[in-house]
Each structure stands twice: as C-alpha cells, then as structure tokens.
A protein has these predicted regions:
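GH16 jelly-roll
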Residues: 1-233
Length: 233
C-alpha cells in the first residue's frame, strides 16, 4: 500500500508511480489496501482470500497472519471519503477463509466518488455471501444528506443475531443474518481505469482516516483480537 501518517491521521493513497495491482486480472486498476489478516495456499494454487477472478493464482509466498480477526463486536471508522469520479473507498470485513465457506463479507461502508456531491452521497453497506451457504446477498446503497468529504463515522454492530449499520450514530439498516466466524478488516482505496487519457483529478488520490476501532462484546475471549494492520500493495 501507499500511505502516510501525520497530524494524527492515516492518508491512504494512490500515487503517480504506483503500478496496477494485477494487470492480467484487473487491467489498469490501482489499489492501496491495509488488511489485518493474510491467508493463502501454496505457490501456484488458487487458495486465497476474497477471490476476485477464477484465474487468480498465488504468485508470491507469504506467511499467513492473523493480526486482528474479531468474532462479533462493533467496528467503527472515522474517515473522509473522496469525490474523485475514478475512485472508491471502503472498509470491508471478510472471512479469513482458512475454510473456503468462511468467505462472507460485511461491507461497513463503500463510497464511489461518482456518487458524491457536497450535499449528499450514496454509501454502500450490507452483506455479501460469496461461498458461504449460510448467508444471502443483502447489499444496498443508502443516500445520506451529508458531505462525506468531511469526517464522519461509519459503524457496524455485529452480533450472532444481526448486523446493523450506522452513520454518525444513526441507524441506517439492520440485517437478520450474521457471519459466524472470525473476520479480518480491509481498508481500501481503488482507482479504476477511465476512458480518457488522464485521471479525473491529479494523483495522489487520498482516503484520509482518523481511526478504525474495534470493540469486543462482554464474554468474548481476547484471542485473535489484538494487533496492528498489515499492508499490501
């Protein structure tokens, strides 16, 4: 990932000399992602996390890591999104996927710059099952009348019974389903290739984050709950 830390904030960036992350699979898409876990199979295998393409294979061997993989709790982010039409910023929670079926995703917040105006924005939130047969697709964009280019809080409450989504402490939606396994966090900024010679705005592109916090519910063991974020470019 490309990032800087200063003034008490994390600045997750897409920079001018940054190469596309996987040209054979995603063309010219660039991404910076901080994640709190890493799991993959042997070199050349198709075993890995958050599969983006059926042709994806393990190209580099890395040590598997669990830095912060909570199982239920509250996750909260305070951040500024971007109005850049070529970009998307997000905080996702995904299954660690040491078992393929443990692959569901909780999307805490996902914001495309093309959906941002000074008066309002569409904020994506919900659950994607992927290969988890116990979950069903329930994802939507909620239009909120705030300027997401300023700091706001995006929160998910994750219990055995439900997943609830909040913006600035206000409930947006609640789902009666819940992944029942540890999940890692994925903090991302994407720059999508555009049908024009130059990007919509000059690089670097920015996703400024004040904090990401996790709260453990009473009675839950502390194993796999402490650590710091891992970076992937």
């Amino acid at each position: 990932a490309r990032y800087r830390v200063g003034g008490g904030h994390l600045d997750l960036r897409i920079e001018d000399d940054q190469q596309p992350w996987a040209p054979p699979l995603d063309g010219q898409m660039r991404v910076s992602s901080l994640q709190t876990g890493l799991f993959a199979g042997p070199l050349g295998s198709d075993i890995g996390q958050h599969g983006v393409h059926p042709a994806a294979r393990v190209r580099e061997e890395w040590k598997n890591q669990r830095l912060y993989t909570p199982h239920y709790g509250v996750i909260e982010m305070r951040a500024k999104a971007t109005a850049d039409a070529d970009c998307m910023v997000a905080l996702w929670m995904i299954g660690y996927e040491e078992v393929p079926e443990r692959s569901g995703e909780i999307c805490v917040a996902e914001i495309f710059g093309r959906d941002v105006s000074p008066e309002s924005a569409a904020v994506g939130m919900g659950v994607h099952p992927f290969d988890d047969p116990t979950l069903h697709e329930d994802f939507t964009q909620v239009r909120v009348e705030i300027d997401v280019r300023r700091f706001h809080t995006y929160t998910v409450e994750w219990t055995p019974e439900h997943v609830a989504f909040f913006i600035d402490g206000h409930l947006q939606r609640s789902l009666d389903q819940s992944p029942d396994y540890p999940m890692q966090l994925m903090l991302n900024i994407y720059e999508f290739p555009a049908d024009r010679p130059e990007p919509a705005t000059a690089r670097p592109k920015h996703f400024v984050v004040d904090y990401v916090r996790g709260y453990r519910p009473d009675g839950v063991p502390t194993s796999h709950l402490r650590g710091s974020a891992a970076a992937a470019d």
